[in-house]
Amino acid sequence: MAKLIRRGFISLILVVIMCTSLFVGCGSKYEFNHDYLFGLCDPSGSLGGGVDKAITNEWLGDVADVLGVKSFRLWVNIDSSTGNGMFFVDSDNNLSFNKGYLAKVHDYVDNLKRGGVENFLFLNTTYLSPYESSMTGFDVPDVNENPDEYLEFIKLNAKAYGMLAEEFPEIKNWETGNEPDLGGAGMHKHGYVYGANSAINKPFIFSDREIAEIICDLSWYIRKELKAVNEENRVSLPGLSLYYDVDHSFFESIYEVIESKTAPFGQEFSDTDPDNYFDIIDYHPYMNADKFSPPYYLKFPEEMWDEWTNTQLEIHEIASDHGDKDKPAYFSEFGYTDVGERFNGNLQNNIADNYVIAFDIIKEKMPWVEVVFCFRATTLVYQKASDNKTEENYGIFYNQDDPDHGGKAKPAAKKLAEYFGTYDANKFAAFENKYKKK
């Protein structure tokens, strides 16, 4: 029986294990695939759960078609404890699909496939918790307080991914969470309160080391389940923010956990090969514009582009130092907000130009980046965010229910389509006519 200890007592680095059907690696050089570089991401309002209702499955499929994107990051809630998610957990911790929600997700995927998407990245927006647990959302058991519940939590979520892989064979890339490193918002102990001040939430926030350990445990167990379904399935790191990780210490801590011979938790061995935890490096390289005052995003100075480029090169260097030079990277969120300046033509054009500059740099200096998922498809009308001027005004299209620009493409949408050779003026005109505000 596996011992519930963090430190494994057998250091399992045997090649015979690494090369089984459940694990890959063995030092072969990875061939980067850039066919799917242009990606998009947005949750669907058709799934419910507080997402803007104007962002429908049909609309997202039409957006994919008019843009010509081949990659899409799916946002799915796997926890049905509130009635709106993928799985139910029974008293024996067995899982069953919520058939109504499952049908909506199939429609989400099918509409995107209709729009030409071939490369999917699956993101779960919540975690599953054991039946008798009081946890919800992004709550994670504290392994130091309740190791049994922690291990059950890890295995339950891994099992869910295996069931999803069987249900959605067209999805080959699987993300294990979103921004767990962002101050507790994406991963925390039970008792964390969204919107509360830091003094109240401090006892419920994991340390960076603890977050890295949870990431490694989830990734290892999930990868094992996914590979058992299809060897082509790949696990990505959860979409790391890294926005405040200026010295890259958090990113490096993931490798430190793997190399410390303390992971995965609950096994009678340690596994020190990063390939057995994740196949894709995944983070959100938003540009740090905090130092610039309004008007935002005019023309970024050259030194800002240099700083941004060097940051990505430094992150890749850390991965290379730990044996992951040839591991692909996904930028699972990247984009610009107009902070509500919707009528500022210069601003909109400069945002469009900034996308092109970023893609030029990526193509020239970052061959390991396989997909950039532009965040997001549309501005928000019905879904309100706490920092609404910023969060609600990402999007390369105007929301179809925008009172002034309903259904129109922003300059960035057309510029990106032109850049990737998918622009069709007739398609854009037909799209805008279909969704214009009546």
Regions found by a protein language model. Give the residues of each.
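Sec-dependent N-terminal signal peptides of Gram-positive bacterial secreted proteins and lipoproteins
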Residues: R7-C26
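Boundary/entry segment of secreted carbohydrate-active catalytic domains
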Residues: S28-N77
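Hydrophobic faces of well-ordered beta-strands that scaffold small-molecule active sites
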Residues: F38-D42, K70-L74, N119-L123, W174-T176, ...
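Short, acidic/polar
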Residues: G48-A64, I154-L164, S249-S270, A352-I361
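Substrate-binding cleft and catalytic face of glycoside hydrolase catalytic domains
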Residues: V66-D245, N288, T337, K384
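Aromatic-rich peripheral "rim/lid" segments of glycoside hydrolase catalytic domains that contact
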Residues: F87-F88, S96, P180, A185, ...
